[in-house]
């Protein structure tokens, strides 16, 4: 395979046995595509799809006035340019957003005209608020901080059938229920109760018999019974009754009388159970009617109203039970035909019939009133109100919407494509009547929808059909950024609609324009609330590139419209078979959110309906093809799918008699010809973080979960180091996260320094007349959300040839374009003097000395000068209470210099606040009268370095309100920024010009001219020497003979002119932005931000971890000479406890250690070759041996000798290996690599004690392992207090480091002191060290006087207790005797 420029520098040797069929997709695609489809900014207005903003507008507009005489129509929307770019928004604390304008049309109708006539039309663009924009890396900048909108996994709209699992009723009876969930609108539930009555409820309110709803939609009792029941027919006569025989209905019944055929032969004797054999005999005998005794008719239910044929009198109502009296009455009236309901206890329950019997409503109006009373208790039901409420519930598009997804799910479930032959007649009749339903349909419910749901539910109760699994991913869908933002925007528009409706009636009389009608405030407020404070809008986790990418790929079941932690049970949190390839079964938080927050699998994506789908390779006739299909969980169930590790022959045929497959969520074995699909990759089931764990298949899942989570907490080291043992996905993560800088176009590197890289673009990639130069500015020492340091370093050199997509610069935690979260350490698994007891970690001093785990953290400290009631605060250097030493670091404006080394308590920004006027003593008055104004009326409120922090000032920013004069420091910062921007532009222009003139030279040298400067003769050929005699810009004066060339020359001249103008304009815009006042919160005059770079070295108490969930705390840093060392004198870096492995079952770490040692050993072998100045051929031979021994082969034939030597040089520190998840290195391959490196194949070696020089008695496992330093640093947790702030009421010290609080001395600690009998210590703890106010003061005085004694009084808690008891109206007082 062809390697890119940076990949060629260091190739990762892969042990993958299967070539990748499908590369990992762009990892941020879900976020970026979702938001792009919401904005549709690049699409011309007339060809926009009805989604996102467009859908929100079209669903609300047109808005008509109440009278219908005026309406406001939506034409199109436009997005403007954002006022500030991302970086400026972050610095100034602004939102990166662009203004949204909508073109709307106000149409006023002519009232006087007989038919609808338009009187006037006004069209106008109206400002609709600001819409936050997504950055290129999929985040948003809101009020200066980067945030991520997490996708939500919610229950899909549609219809769901379930039962209570027998938990409701003591008998354990299954109570079935159905629920119609719309995207917007009221939920409609249907449920059976233990007595088998069917009820419905709206929005979980009071339940009512379902027949009330059926009556409300206009059905009569007869229609209701006909829809949900089959009928039996009887012919009555004076002698008895004849029964129309349907033999199938008798199966399983006990015959209550002899059933005989026309010849008199008894087919079924009395009291015998009727079997299938009997039914066949009845069929053959052709019996249509049989005589039955009256008691066979009694107790049955009449299906239709029975009317006296002569008088027309109603003899019996539908749904009435037949009694002896009624039967006699019917005979007397001469009724011949009687139709009853066919019911039995087994599979034809009389549920609807019995429910109809408890329904007290008489007709449609009464039913609707009953529903109105249930929805609006206490309100009088007027005709309009009842009608409006009922229509608004499920039939009004503005109130109720199933959405396309909901309709698709509803139709698939409620209208099955094929109906079971065993289905009852009434159900078949119903489906024949409504006809087939596709996946499309209205967003509102139709009457037939309600009937279909009740039909399916009744069938479930009858024992036919399956309930739904609500945790199936076919029933849960993903709402991404775009959809969530659209819902919020629509909510804002709905608020606007109400106001517009009110104002539209005035539009005609007051001659209003559209902008007078629309107020953008509600829209802005809705959007602002969503992006600023929604549960799904989260502060981005920016510790390292992996944590960023994982945060954006997260799916949460929490949030508005989702679950809550407390209510979510085990089932929702559990791993489900449909998670395969869609949601990672490993990566989820530990704690209360476990299973509710998940991570997308590497290859997963959402389809247009929002369901997760995963790719599979098509298998036809037992042969694997290259066709790749994405299947959702709904579709996947019907296929037989082989795993990615199934053996495939050379011709692509599946090998082996039986192949391990999945079908309908179960594992099974199938023959090759039964297989329909196959996984695309072994690592398809896991997420990005989990697929970064090498040998994941050898780790216990619980530990793998911790490993995946802890990688996200790894702090970027000062010098990132690629993992020796990786999985091959490291490059994808580094590049897709946006941390490493990628080339936008190919070309030659023209200039490199720490700040920027300039690339001269290839001629074939530069557009005609366009500037062929790309300039990449590096991000230098910037603070991330988690205070880690973001810094980019170029990895290319001048003259390098690069292609599009190559890595140009490394960012935090990346090394040559690969993710590098930690450092490769030489580890030994052995106990060492108890210092690695219980997962503690012993580390060599050399690791600290070499700054291996040193990290830089950037702290932002802010001070604001406000306008107070007593006068404005002032940022100044003149502070009386500060000595010269403290002021030495401040400039004349009172702000610290950049580069100053500061420690806790040092002043960074001097500030004074006016103090309230106090009563002056006569002496002070006299002094003030003599010496004038005294400086005591201000107090020092300067910004100081917080306790426990030392660092270097790396940046200062000053923000000044509009209309307030800037101080010298603020002005100098602006001047510096403008100067550097100007230099930047000048450099860019110079590079652009140089590139353009080099291009012209290549174009015109050797061509003929028609004349030109310095008397160039007509027809003369242009030479390079002639061009050198001219000023660059005079080249354009040469008149070319070739017209085509002349046109190209003119295009370049225009391009340069345009670039110059663009640069001038950019400078003017920048100048305007910098010189205008800053937007600050009300009453803030000035704000200063100081950035400190804090260097954190590794120290005892810091938390460290491997990638396999093996975490521990550094217990001791041991001098190098005391560490165990190998035979050649190499001391180990880290000593880990071997007891941490067996019980936790994360064996992956041991395999990583062995393979890491081989990687390092091979690197040393290459190093020895290079030191011996071996020929390139010999080096090439060794590389061939390493890379092509097993696993994925590499082709070095296209590498020049120079390439080979550069590759070998980069491999000196170790040959990086990739062992992909579930397709990694086998033990024999590791052994082979160890052997090739000349290391013991067992991976164990004799170590010597550094203190005594003696060998340890048995061999120790030694090797290289990638170790991370986690963001739980002891510096952030260490805290000490002597005196400090107290709580106002209880007078006890506050708690926590942030409040500079004390340590809690709790109940158990008191018991401990009691047990020791340490009475005085205990008294001191409970009084003067806590809340004895007078005692505290007294102790202070005593210490000042030098007397070390305690006078303890009464703790303040007693006073609090007295006050609390008094608040209960019990008068109690303390006896202070």
From Swiss-Prot:
Organism of provenance: Azoarcus sp. (strain BH72)
Single Gene Ontology MF annotation: DNA binding
Known partners and oligomeric status: The RNAP catalytic core consists of 2 alpha, 1 beta, 1 beta' and 1 omega subunit. When a sigma factor is associated with the core the holoenzyme is formed, which can initiate transcription.
EC class name: transferase
Keyword Metal-binding in annotation: no
Transferase as UniProt keyword: yes
Annotated EC: 2.7.7.6
One GO BP: DNA-templated transcription
The protein's name in its UniProt record: DNA-directed RNA polymerase subunit beta
Entry-linked CDD domains: RNA_pol_B_RPB2
Reaction equation(s) it catalyzes: RNA(n) + a ribonucleoside 5'-triphosphate = RNA(n+1) + diphosphate
Annotated InterPro entries: DNA-dir_RNA_pol_bsu_external_1, DNA-dir_RNA_pol_su2, DNA-dir_RNAP_su2_dom, DNA-dir_RNAP_su2_hyb_sf, RNA_pol_bsu_bac, RNA_pol_bsu_CS, RNA_pol_bsu_protrusion, RNA_pol_Rpb2_2
Annotated Gene3D superfamilies: 2.40.50.100, 2.40.50.150, 3.90.1100.10, DNA-directed RNA polymerase, subunit 2, domain 6 (2.40.270.10), RNA polymerase alpha subunit dimerisation domain (3.90.1800.10), RNA polymerase Rpb2, domain 2 (3.90.1110.10)
Protein purpose: DNA-dependent RNA polymerase catalyzes the transcription of DNA into RNA using the four ribonucleoside triphosphates as substrates.
Family according to the record: Belongs to the RNA polymerase beta chain family.
HAMAP family reported in the protein's UniProt record: RNApol_bact_RpoB (MF_01321)
GO CC annotation terms, alphabetical: DNA-directed RNA polymerase complex
């Amino acid at each position: 395979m062809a390697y890119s420029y940076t990949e060629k520098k260091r190739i990762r040797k892969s042990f993958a046995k299967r070539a990748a069929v499908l590369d990992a997709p762009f990892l941020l695609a879900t976020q970026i595509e979702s938001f792009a489809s919401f904005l549709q900014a690049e699409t011309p207005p007339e060809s926009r799809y009805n989604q996102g903003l467009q859908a929100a507008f079209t669903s609300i507009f047109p808005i008509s006035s109440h009278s219908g005489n005026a309406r406001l129509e939506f034409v199109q929307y436009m997005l403007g340019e954002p006022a500030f770019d991302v970086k400026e928004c972050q610095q100034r604390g602004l939102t990166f957003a662009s203004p949204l304008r909508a073109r709307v049309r106000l149409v006023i109708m002519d009232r006087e005209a007989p038919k609808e006539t338009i009187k006037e039309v006004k069209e106008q663009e109206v400002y609709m608020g600001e819409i936050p924009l997504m950055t290129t890396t999929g985040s948003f900048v809101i009020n200066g901080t980067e945030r991520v909108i997490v996708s939500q996994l919610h229950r899909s709209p549609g219809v769901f059938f379930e039962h209570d699992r027998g938990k409701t009723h003591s008998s354990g009876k299954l109570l079935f229920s159905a629920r119609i969930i719309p995207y917007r609108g009221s939920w409609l539930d249907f449920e059976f109760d233990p007595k088998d009555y069917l009820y419905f409820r709206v929005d979980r309110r009071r339940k009512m018999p379902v027949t009330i709803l059926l009556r409300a939609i206009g059905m009569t009792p007869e229609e209701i019974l006909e829809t949900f029941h089959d009928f039996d027919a009887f012919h009555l006569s004076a002698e008895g009754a004849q029964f129309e025989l349907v033999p199938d209905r008798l199966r399983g019944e006990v015959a209550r009388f002899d059933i005989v055929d026309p010849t008199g032969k008894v087919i079924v004797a009395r009291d015998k159970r009727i079997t299938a054999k009997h039914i066949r005999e009845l069929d053959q005998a052709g019996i249509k009617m049989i005589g039955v005794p009256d008691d066979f008719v009694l107790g049955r239910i009449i299906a239709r109203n029975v009317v006296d044929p002569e008088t027309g009198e109603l003899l019996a109502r539908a749904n009435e039970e037949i009694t002896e009296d009624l039967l006699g009455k019917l005979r007397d009236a001469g009724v011949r035909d009687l139709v009853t309901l066919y019911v039995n206890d087994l599979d034809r329950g009389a549920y609807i019939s019995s429910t109809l019997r408890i329904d007290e409503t008489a007709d449609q109006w009464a039913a609707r009133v009953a529903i109105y009373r249930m929805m609006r208790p206490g309100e009088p039901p007027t005709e309009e109100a009842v009608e409006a409420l009922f229509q608004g519930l499920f039939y009004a598009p503005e109130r109720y919407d199933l959405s396309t997804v909901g309709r698709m799910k509803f139709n698939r479930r409620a209208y099955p494509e094929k109906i079971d032959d065993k289905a009852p007649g009434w159900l078949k009749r119903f489906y024949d009547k409504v006809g087939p339903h596709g996946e499309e349909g209205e967003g509102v419910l139709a009457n037939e929808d309600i009937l279909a749901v009740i039909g399916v539910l009744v069938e479930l109760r009858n024992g036919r059909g399956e309930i739904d699994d609500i945790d199936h991913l076919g029933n849960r869908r993903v709402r991404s950024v775009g959809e969530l933002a659209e819902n919020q925007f629509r909510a804002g528009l709905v608020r606007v609609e109400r106001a517009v409706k009110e104002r539209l009636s005035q539009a005609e009389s007051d001659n209003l324009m559209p902008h007078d009608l629309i107020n953008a405030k509600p829209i802005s407020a809705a959007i602002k609330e969503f992006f600023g404070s929604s549960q799904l809008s989260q502060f981005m986790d920016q510790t390292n590139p992996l944590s960023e990418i994982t945060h954006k790929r997260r799916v949460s079941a929490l949030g508005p419209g989702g679950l809550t932690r407390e209510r979510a049970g085990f089932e929702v949190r559990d791993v489900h078979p449909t998670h395969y390839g869609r949601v990672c079964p490993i990566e989820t938080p530990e704690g209360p959110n476990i299973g509710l927050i998940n991570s997308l699998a590497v290859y997963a994506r959402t389809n247009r309906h929002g369901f997760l789908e995963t790719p599979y390779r098509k298998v036809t006739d037992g042969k694997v093809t290259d066709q790749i299909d994405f299947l959702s969980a709904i579709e996947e169930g019907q296929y037989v799918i082989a795993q990615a590790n199934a053996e495939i022959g050379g011709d692509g045929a599946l090998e082996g008699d039986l192949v391990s497959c999945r079908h309908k969520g179960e594992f099974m074995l199938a023959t090759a010809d039964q297989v329909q699909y196959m996984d695309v990759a072994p690592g398809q089931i896991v997420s990005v973080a989990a697929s970064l764990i090498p040998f994941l298949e050898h780790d216990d899942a619980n530990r793998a979960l911790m490993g995946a989570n802890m990688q996200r907490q790894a702090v970027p080291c000062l010098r990132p180091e690629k993992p020796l043992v990786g999985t091959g996905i490291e490059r994808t993560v580094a590049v897709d996260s946006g941390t490493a800088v990628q080339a936008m176009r190919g070309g030659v590197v023209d200039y490199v320094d720490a700040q920027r890289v300039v690339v001269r673009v290839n001629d074939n990639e530069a557009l005609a007349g366009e500037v062929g130069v790309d300039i990449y500015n590096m991000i230098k020492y910037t603070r991330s959300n988690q205070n880690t340091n973001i810094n980019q370093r170029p990895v290319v050199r001048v003259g390098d040839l690069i292609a599009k997509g190559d890595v140009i610069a490394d960012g935090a935690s990346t090394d040559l374009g690969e993710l590098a979260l930690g450092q490769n350490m030489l580890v030994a698994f052995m106990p060492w003097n108890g210092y690695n007891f219980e997962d503690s970690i012993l580390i060599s001093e050399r690791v600290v000395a070499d700054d291996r785990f040193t990290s830089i953290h950037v702290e932002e400290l802010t001070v604001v000068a406000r306008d107070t009631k007593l006068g404005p605060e002032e940022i100044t250097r003149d502070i009386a209470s500060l000595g010269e030493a403290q002021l030495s670091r401040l400039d004349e404006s009172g702000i610290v210099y950049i580069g100053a080394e500061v420690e806790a308590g040092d002043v960074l920004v001097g500030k004074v606040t006016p103090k309230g006027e106090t009563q002056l003593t006569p002496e002070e008055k006299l002094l003030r009268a003599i010496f004038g104004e005294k400086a005591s009326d201000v107090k020092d409120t300067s910004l100081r370095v917080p306790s426990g922090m030392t660092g270097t000032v790396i940046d200062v920013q000053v923000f000044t309100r509009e209309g307030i004069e800037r101080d010298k420091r603020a002005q100098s910062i602006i001047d510096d920024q403008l100067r550097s921007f100007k230099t930047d532009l000048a450099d860019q222009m110079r590079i652009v010009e140089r590139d353009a003139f080099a291009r012209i030279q290549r174009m015109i040298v050797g061509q003929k001219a028609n004349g030109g400067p310095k008397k160039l003769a007509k027809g003369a050929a242009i030479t390079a020497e002639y061009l050198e005699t001219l000023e660059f810009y005079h080249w354009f004066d040469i008149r070319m003979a070739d017209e085509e060339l002349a046109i190209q020359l003119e295009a370049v001249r225009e391009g340069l002119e345009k670039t110059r103008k663009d640069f001038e304009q950019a400078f003017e815009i920048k100048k305007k932005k910098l010189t205008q006042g800053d937007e600050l919160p009300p009453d803030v005059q000035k704000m200063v931000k100081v950035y400190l770079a804090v260097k954190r070295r590794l120290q005892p108490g810091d938390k460290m971890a491997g990638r396999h969930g093996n975490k521990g705390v550094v217990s001791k840093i041991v001098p190098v000479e005391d560490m165990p060392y190998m035979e050649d004198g190499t001391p180990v870096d880290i000593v880990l406890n071997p007891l941490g492995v067996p019980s936790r079952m994360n064996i992956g770490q041991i395999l990583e250690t062995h393979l890491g040692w081989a990687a390092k050993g091979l690197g040393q072998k290459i190093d020895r070759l290079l030191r011996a100045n071996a020929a390139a051929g010999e080096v090439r031979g060794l590389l061939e041996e390493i890379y092509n021994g097993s696993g994925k082969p590499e082709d070095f034939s296209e590498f020049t000798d120079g390439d080979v030597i550069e590759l070998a040089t980069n491999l000196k520190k170790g040959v990086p290996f990739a062992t992909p998840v579930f397709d990694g290195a086998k033990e024999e391959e590791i052994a082979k690599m160890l052997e090739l490196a000349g290391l013991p194949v067992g991976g164990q070696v004799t170590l010597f004690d550094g203190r005594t020089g003696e060998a340890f008695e048995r061999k120790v496992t030694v090797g290289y392992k990638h170790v991370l330093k986690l963001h739980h640093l002891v510096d952030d947790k260490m805290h000490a207090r002597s005196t400090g702030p107290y709580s106002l009421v209880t007078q006890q010290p506050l708690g926590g480091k942030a409040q500079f609080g004390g340590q809690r001395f709790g109940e158990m600690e008191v018991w401990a002191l009691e047990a020791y009998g340490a009475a005085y210590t205990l008294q001191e703890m409970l009084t003067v060290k806590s809340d004895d106010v007078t005692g505290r003061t007294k102790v202070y005085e005593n210490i000042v006087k030098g007397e070390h004694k305690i006078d303890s009084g009464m703790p303040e808690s007693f006073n609090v207790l007295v006050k609390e008891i008094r608040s209960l109206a019990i008068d109690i007082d303390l006896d202070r005797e």
